[in-house]
Amino acid sequence: MAGRQEKELQNVTLLGSEQTEYKYSYDPRVLETFDNQHPYRDYMVKFNCPEFTTLCPKTGQPDFATLYISYIPEQKMVESKSLKLYLFSFRNHGDFHEDSVNTIMNDLIELMDPRYIEVWGKFTPRGGISIDPYCNYGKKGTKYEEIANYRLMNHDLYPETITNR
């Protein structure tokens, strides 16, 4: 395989740009995709995002988390710089932890239509409690729907030891 042709990258506008515009309000329009060159194969793509920040919708206090986003692509894949800028757009966005991870998953489903996706947020403690929301999705009527159900019920059977993150 010779790599990607320029025409395959025409929708990737942020990567390599000399001018990066950071959105300070939630904006899913910043997300970009590129074609999956291996749609005949199941494989997992995982993003580890240790610097996610959002705001408490009630107090305006900052919330910090590590996000884990994993998916099995179909035809489209999310471009990583656009994902970084998208996650940055949550910086001044007020939402609960549970809503944030579900919003991220829903936006990525709409963008890529993956076979399977999961988003797990591991938020730092506030008031002595950490919240770790997990959500996932598998295409309806496929084996990925079954995988999603299994993963949901078994995703945290062996929780880590919390050492104040």
Swiss-Prot record:
GO terms for cellular component: cytoplasm. Pathway: tRNA modification; tRNA-queuosine biosynthesis. Gene3D superfamilies: 3.30.1130.10. GO terms for biological process: queuosine biosynthetic process; tRNA modification. Pfam families: QueF (PF14489). Substrate binds at V78, E79, S80, H97, E98. Its EC number is 1.7.1.13. It is found in: Cytoplasm. It catalyses: 7-aminomethyl-7-carbaguanine + 2 NADP(+) = 7-cyano-7-deazaguanine + 2 NADPH + 3 H(+). The active site is at C56, D63. Signal peptide: none annotated. Its main location: cytoplasm. InterPro entries: GTP-CH-I_C/QueF (IPR043133), NADPH_dep_7-cyano-7-deazaG_red (IPR050084), QueF (IPR029500), QueF_type1 (IPR016856). Keywords: Cytoplasm, NADP, Oxidoreductase, Queuosine biosynthesis. Belongs to the GTP cyclohydrolase I family. QueF type 1 subfamily. Catalyzes the NADPH-dependent reduction of 7-cyano-7-deazaguanine (preQ0) to 7-aminomethyl-7-deazaguanine (preQ1). NCBIfam families: QueF-II. This is NADPH-dependent 7-cyano-7-deazaguanine reductase. It comes from Shouchella clausii (strain KSM-K16) (Alkalihalobacillus clausii). The lineage of its organism: Bacteria, Bacillati, Bacillota, Bacilli, Bacillales.
